Amino acid sequence: MKKIKHTFYDINTEKAQNTERKAESELVLFCLSDLHGNEYGKQNRVIVETAWDQKPDLILAAGDMLSGEKEESDAVAVALLSRLADLAPVCFTDGNHEMQVKKFFPERYEAFMEGLKKGGVQVLHNETWCTEDGGQKVAV
């Protein structure tokens, strides 16, 4: 099994407002990228458990969740992001692998997008999505 890289950032901003739910306006983001359809444990158990442990307010899937070369990677990515959507809102944006699939296999790409949407994932295409968490407004 490939290793997962964990990186933690603490970002402070005066733009954040105190909220009812969290001390000091804490907002926890969980970001995934470049999984290329790989699984980390059965049904991506390692990623799902890591996300649950972090208790994120928002999950960002920053592209390259699938592999242009492996069609079976589509189902892996849809299953993972749909499962994570049960934990917190998930926003997805294309990476270069998704763009290649869109260009060369448009039907496959559309099926992938539909799978994400059915799984409760917010798919972003050059747009902004806004949500509110415990009084804290967030624009992605």
Question: Residues of each region from the PLM?
Answer:
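N-terminal active-site segment of His-dependent metallophosphoesterases
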Residues: 1-83
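Phenylalanine-focused residue identity feature
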Residues: 8, 30, 52, 92, ...
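Generic marker of "main functional regions" within proteins
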Residues: 21, 42-45, 58-61, 75, ...
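Short, structurally constrained coil/turn elements
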Residues: 23, 84-86, 117, 133-134
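Conserved catalytic scaffold of divalent metal-dependent phosphoesterases
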Residues: 35-37, 67, 98-140
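Alpha-helix C-terminal capping/helix-to-coil transition sites in glycosyltransferase folds
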Residues: 53-55, 87, 118
